[in-house]
């Protein structure tokens, strides 16, 4: 599967979850349900996957934890907050660079319309 086809599956499941559960739950609930539904579709994923950081030649095993890494291609960062800030998008871009991945999805479930809560972040594009 390509990054785009994986992302399409993730977005489709996110829409379904938001329709059924609505906004206002803890991030951990959305993460668990999203992971379960993606696995039902046959997608491989890791939850709370530690991603190491290398800084000036020193490797730190616990740089950060990715909420979900799907098919070893797409990092999903899940939020349930009032508003996504530019910092959240930059944070996901940093995760993508450190994990050497090209595509990330920032999904905020605490919105009226889920389409307003999904941001696609691509590593490697000029800003």
Model-derived features with residue positions:
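Nucleic-acid nuclease catalytic cores
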Residues: 79-127
């Amino acid at each position: 599967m390509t990054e785009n086809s994986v992302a399409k599956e993730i977005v489709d499941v996110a829409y379904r979850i938001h329709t059924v559960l609505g906004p206002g739950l803890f991030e951990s609930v959305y993460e668990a349900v999203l992971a379960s539904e993606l696995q039902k579709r046959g997608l491989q994923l890791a939850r709370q996957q530690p991603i190491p950081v290398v800084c000036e030649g020193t490797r730190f095993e616990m740089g950060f934890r990715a909420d979900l890494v799907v098919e070893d291609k797409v990092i999903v960062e899940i939020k349930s907050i009032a508003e996504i800030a530019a910092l959240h998008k930059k944070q996901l871009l940093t995760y993508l660079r450190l994990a050497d991945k090209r595509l990330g999805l920032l999904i905020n479930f605490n919105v009226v319309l889920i389409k307003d809560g999904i941001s696609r972040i691509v590593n490697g594009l000029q800003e």
